[in-house]
Regions:
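Glyoxalase I/VOC metalloenzyme domain signal
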Residues: 1-41, 50-242
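Catalytic cores of carbohydrate-active enzymes
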Residues: 44-45
Length: 242
């Protein structure tokens, strides 16, 4: 068996959870701040003129885990994509009691350009180009896939931090405002297309059907810490990693 390329040796960078309403958003933010997490990014509004999100991101200095909490803000005549799980349901059914939804998992690589090219060569589809910017600690490169599953709103982010992200700790900004806004606009355009057509262009549509599960397993099996991916509900519902 050939050795795993270094760019495929992935590590969880952060995960992003969507909130149904302002009360849920505030409660989750308050809980995290009272559980040893420190803020690393916050904005009250970023997006388009009519729809947007509020975002709070934090870091646990004890575990190194980063979490982003997002509230979608819809307009009277337009739903924010960040409200899609609550407006349209997920896991194949309406979800009137759901207060949160795990929107995406960010996986860190040492070379996002090689990783993106590798996956695209197999037929995988990305929603965005590679955004190149800097946070408080150094260069930050990010690219986002199209959604993975028909009955979910879940996607993957691949991120490259050109500094030791495991040792910087709290303090400073570890997300980039321009990238957050660019992602919002791209996701909202993708969501409008889905509302119009009822069809999703998914991450693995261009991969031969027989190879799709294998490619996901290749990504997730090479992700540290082992077992973390299985705790992400949309993945656990759709992919067998055993």
């Amino acid at each position: 068996m050939p050795a795993t390329p270094s760019f495929m040796k992935l590590k969880v960078d952060h995960k992003t959870v969507l909130c149904r309403d302002l009360n849920t958003y505030r409660a989750l933010r308050d809980f995290l701040l009272n559980s040893g997490y420190s803020p690393v990014y916050e904005t009250d509004r970023v997006g388009e003129e009519r729809t947007a999100t509020a975002t709070f991101a934090c870091l646990s200095s004890l575990t190194g885990e980063r979490l982003a909490v997002v509230l979608g803000m819809s307009a009277p005549n337009e739903v924010s994509h960040a409200q899609a799980p609550f407006a349209y349901g997920f896991a194949g059914k309406p979800q009137k009691d759901a207060q949160t939804y795990m929107q995406h998992l960010a996986l860190r690589t040492n070379d996002v350009e090689k990783l993106k090219s590798h996956l695209e060569s197999k037929g995988a589809a990305f929603l965005t180009p590679i955004y190149k910017d800097k946070d408080s600690f150094g260069p930050l490169l990010q690219s986002f896939t199209r959604e993975l599953f028909d009955d979910e709103w879940f996607f993957i982010e691949f991120v490259q931090r050109d500094y030791d992200a495991d040792t910087v700790g709290a303090g400073g900004t570890q997300f980039v405002q321009n990238t957050v806004k660019s992602l919002y606009v791209s996701k909202q355009e993708e969501f409008r297309e889905w509302e119009k057509t009822g069809k999703k262009r998914k991450f693995l549509d261009g991969v031969p059907a027989k190879d799709r599960t294998k490619l996901l397993q290749e990504i997730f099996a090479n992700t540290e810490p082992k077992g973390y991916v299985q705790t992400v509900a949309p993945i656990a519902r759709n992919v067998s990693l055993g």
